[in-house]
Amino acid sequence: MLAWPIGLLIWANGKIDHIDALSGAADTPGTTYLLAGSDSREGGVIEDPETQGARTDTIMVLHVPESGPTALISLPRDAYVEIPGQGGSKLNAAFSWGGAPLLVQTVEQLTGLTVDHYVEVGFGGIEQLVDAVGGVELCSDLTVDDADSGMVWTPGCREVGGVDALAFARMRKADPAGDIGRAERQQQLIAALSGKVENPALVLKPGQQTALLSAGTGALTVSEGTGILDLGSLALAFRNAKGEGGITGTPPIVDLDYRPGNVGSTVRLDPDQTPGFFAAIAAGTWPAGPTGGMPGG
């Protein structure tokens, strides 16, 4: 019995793609994961004209301090930030211009946290992951019929397969909260997936284990030195962040339609509060619970 899970982990570890993503900056206390959801809009998926080619539609910082609550912070992809060597632009432009390394540098500059592990999930792999666990339950109060993402929804909760889960995670334009609402749905989807993966019944289903690991590792690209055990630690940290003693949300936001120049509509983070917010996240002194969100919320 012991040989099966050990062999499965070794097999899965060998299937994960690795890239040179980390900056080599001096370590900061605690452990910081940068999670990015990349979306090439290929394979017959309805295309959003604002996201030609590969983009990061999901950018999250997961920080485990030396003491204090674990924090999962969604960084709006349209947040207006300074990108090293490029100037001010939308956060996800860093990935377009310089891939994972420039995204890591940009997030480190914004947050003051050194990224220890970079984990990129191909959005196409989300569909396979959801199907591999037999579907997930998702909830939304919105009425949606969105051609760009493919999301069709009536208010309430329901069990969905991979195609609908992917549309749920992608939809932005039909949500009054825009990028912020999408970030909340993406966190909900990841939590639902994590709950299914942690189900003890999965241990008794070797075939489903193999399908899940195959889908998961096939969808992942991680930084050099990040292995399957680090991903296990990430999953535990994510669960802690989503629990009662964790922190979830966004940095402080002051404007959802900030137009600083030739980059269109962006999200403006609060320039006065954001540095202190991330300093408190790093130190483990920010209070547990939801944080950030819509201006005035």
Label the predicted regions.
Residues M1-G297:
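Non-catalytic, solvent-exposed segments at the cell envelope interface
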